[in-house]
Amino acid sequence: MYDDGKELPLGDGKIRLCRIKTRDKEHIRVYRKQSQSKEQILCMVSGMEGGEFYRAAAIRWLREYARAEFEKKVRFYADKMQVSVNRIAVKEQKTRWGSCSMKGNLNFNWKLALMPERIMDYVVVHELAHRKQMNHSAAFWKEVELVLPDYRERKQWLSEHEKEFAEY
């Protein structure tokens, strides 16, 4: 899954993994670059052996990327929906894509960053709607629909494709 040359989905595009061998067997340096052909590349530089080190490094980078994306999206949609948020956390959750606590703490699954942007937007709006309605009542779905009139299609896409992303 995280092998050299493997392409991973990333938002509306893809990112290719690239392992660069060095003599350093203690550290992995990870950075993103764009090739001349505009291809996104996630470079992992190390002399370490074993795919698990590279998998962990790639996931660490993806989580940081997801955090930055969620922070931008939450700011944008929270302002639009006129709600406040306390804290944003990005985690690996087995059964949830997001959650919202009574205190306004939002949790998001980092694997959402692999999905199309419109799906990330849907989950963000869904969780922010809980700042007004801490349930899934008709009033809750009306809050979601005010921001995303096509939320049903996005919700359906997530339901149909979520198993594909569980393997990452």
Residue ranges of each PLM-predicted region?
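Walker B beta-strand of ABC/ABC-like P-loop ATPase nucleotide-binding domains
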Residues: 124
